[in-house]
Amino acid sequence: MHHQDIVSIDNLKTLPVLRKSELVRLQAENPPLGGLIAGTVHDFNQIFQSPGPIYEPGMVKKDWWRSARALNAAGIGKGDIVQNCFSYHFTPAGMLSEQGILAVGATVFPAGTGQTELQARAASEIGVTAY
């Protein structure tokens, strides 16, 4: 199947499903991205590791992960300070959220996980408006 074969929503039903276990196997056989990209790892700004392990490429571009729409729908935007408690360690969750937060014009406090008392204190002192 080629991208030009997808001309309608109905064509999406014909796309094969790639299961997580298959992705792990492909990446183990052809590290790091399983031969599934049309370039090299050097074409990306970031590489993340998610449980599996699964390696995921990423880019530092405005809303690369397409998370701004959900944040905008939640009313987050310019003037907000968002305490981003997703992990920045290995997984893309922290950067995924951060790029969306920046795309809607809000300020990011990259807090990560843990240290509950410090998190609460920082939220109060910084004036966090979203979590």
Locate predicted features:
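AMP-binding/adenylate-forming
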Residues: E56-R69, I81-Y131
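Nucleotide 5′-phosphate-binding alpha/beta core
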Residues: M1-A73, G77-D80
